[in-house]
């Protein structure tokens, strides 16, 4: 059995998957905030319960919103303070007496989608998250590509390309990102960025769902905004896809629920790619809230 943990700031979610990659059981508990010991106990107790329930010693994979900084799995995880700066992988491997695998939640999202029954036919899968921020991951032949610093797929921290400024205007403001750089595409393509662009052009403060509702009602201003956003997304993806050249692009995060993104993006991409390039198949993520658990569990499918 494959145990996958999706760990966030508020909850620890465990999903147990069988050899056919089907979810057999799941359980959630609150994430301890103050005590590393309590955090380890919470994970270990869930593993013990799963072992007892299924009568096996399952493999353990963990997806967490942070970046392992060393080989022992020491984390930088601002949203999970109890575990940040701690050798999480090494400590859990010792306590559970098994190989614990650890990756960031965006890579687990991409891995979950790459192992979808239909998507396993594609050698190179790119996962793109358009949510509170912009992130993602790359999976090659069923294995996540992490890089030496675990930042492969941090697409949101690429800078606006010159074609974006041609589209938006060379006086378009380059906003400072939380990472400290200027002009990161996360500030324009995330859910927050979607709303910021609307306010920038129309001087109205609306959230993304409100703007999308107006678009669905046929509002001309919302329609113009969505067209501009999709053009900007295509421009920015042009650089990324030229570097990565994936077979499949899977889009997740809150904005993936807006169908125009997956249905209207493909037609905009070719003019931003090399003439010989083929645009990837574009699909909306299929596994929703279970994606983090799935991807973490499937870290052990990559042997």
Swiss-Prot record:
Pfam family, one: ROK
CDD domains per the UniProt record, alphabetical: ASKHA_NBD_ROK_NAGK
Pathway participation: Cell wall biogenesis; peptidoglycan recycling
GO molecular function, one term: ATP binding
Keyword ATP-binding in record: yes
GO BP, sorted A to Z: N-acetylglucosamine metabolic process; peptidoglycan turnover
Catalytic activity: N-acetyl-D-glucosamine + ATP = N-acetyl-D-glucosamine 6-phosphate + ADP + H(+)
Entry annotated with the keyword Isomerase: no
Residue sites binding ATP per the record: 4-11, 133-140
Keywords recorded for this protein, A-Z: ATP-binding, Carbohydrate metabolism, Kinase, Metal-binding, Nucleotide-binding, Transferase, Zinc
E.C. numbers: 2.7.1.59
UniProt: Zn(2+) binding residues: 157, 177, 179, 184
Alphabetized NCBIfam families for the sequence: PRK13310.1 (NF009835)
Family in the record: Belongs to the ROK (NagC/XylR) family. NagK subfamily.
Record function comment: Catalyzes the phosphorylation of N-acetyl-D-glucosamine (GlcNAc) derived from cell-wall degradation, yielding GlcNAc-6-P.
Protein name per the record: N-acetyl-D-glucosamine kinase
């Amino acid at each position: 059995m494959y145990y996958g943990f999706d760990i966030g700031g508020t909850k620890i979610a465990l999903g147990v998957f069988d050899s056919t990659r089907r979810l057999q059981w799941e359980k959630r508990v609150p994430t301890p905030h103050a005590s590393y010991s309590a955090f380890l106990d919470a994970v270990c107790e869930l593993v013990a319960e799963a072992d007892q329930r299924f009568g096996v010693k399952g493999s353990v994979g963990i997806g967490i919103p942070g970046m392992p900084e060393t080989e022992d799995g020491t984390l930088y995880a601002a949203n999970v303070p109890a575990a940040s700066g701690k050798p999480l992988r090494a400590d859990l491997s010792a306590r559970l007496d098994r190989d614990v695998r650890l990756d960031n939640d965006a890579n687990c999202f991409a891995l979950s989608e790459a192992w979808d029954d239909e998507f396993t036919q594609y050698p190179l899968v790119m996962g793109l998250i358009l949510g509170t921020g912009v992130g993602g991951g790359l999976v090659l032949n069923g294995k996540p590509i992490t890089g030496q610093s675990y930042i492969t797929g941090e697409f949101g921290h690429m800078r606006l390309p010159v074609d974006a400024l041609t589209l938006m205007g060379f006086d378009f403001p380059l906003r400072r990102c939380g990472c400290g750089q200027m002009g990161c595409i996360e500030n324009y393509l995330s859910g927050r960025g979607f709303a910021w662009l609307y306010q920038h052009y129309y001087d109205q403060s609306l959230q993304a769902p409100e703007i999308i509702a107006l678009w669905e009602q046929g509002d001309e201003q919302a329609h113009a905004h969505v067209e501009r956003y999709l053009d900007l997304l295509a421009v920015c993806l042009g650089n990324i896809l030229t570097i990565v050249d994936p077979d499949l692009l899977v889009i997740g995060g809150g904005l993936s629920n807006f169908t125009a993104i997956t249905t209207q993006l493909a037609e905009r991409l070719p003019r931003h790619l090399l003439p010989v390039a083929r645009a990837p198949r574009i699909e909306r993520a299929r596994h929703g809230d279970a994606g983090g658990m799935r991807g973490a569990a499937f870290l052990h499918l990559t042997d």
